[in-house]
Amino acid sequence: MNKLLKWATEIDSIAQAGLTYSKDVYDIDRFNQLKNIAADIISESTNLELHKVKEVLFEERGYLTPKVDVRAAIIKENKILLVKEKLDGTWSLPGGWADINLSVSENIKKEAYEEAGAKVKPKSIIAILDRNKHNKPLMVQSIYKIFILCDLLDVNFNDNIETE
């Protein structure tokens, strides 16, 4: 992540914390100004449209924390199961956003089944990565990707809205 983008996301995080905890109307106005400045910097640094950056930054409420993405590493007979994303045609491990009220294990079972029709038994977490340190393009949000090694119990792929 380049320094300018790093600083902009830190400014946004500080502004969001201020908006969450401040009661003073003048401070709230200043924190909103900081969020707008952060959005301008992010837009200029990434070539993302300003209104889209603002949509992401201003929809967040509360203290900012990373989003969590879970991915199933399903290996059988030296082959790894990948799914093709309908959105952009790229190949990836089955997975997605972690849902609230589900454990990491429950989330990975759900995602593997939804995206690949795979019934799995999660064995162990093999990696936790900060997405922006390992992927392009950079995302406005901070995302932690949790990779879970899974045993494949059964597979029966069904057409779905996310993968093919």
Predicted regions, residues:
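Acidic, metal-coordinating catalytic segment for phosphate/diphosphate chemistry
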Residues: Y26-I28, N32-R71
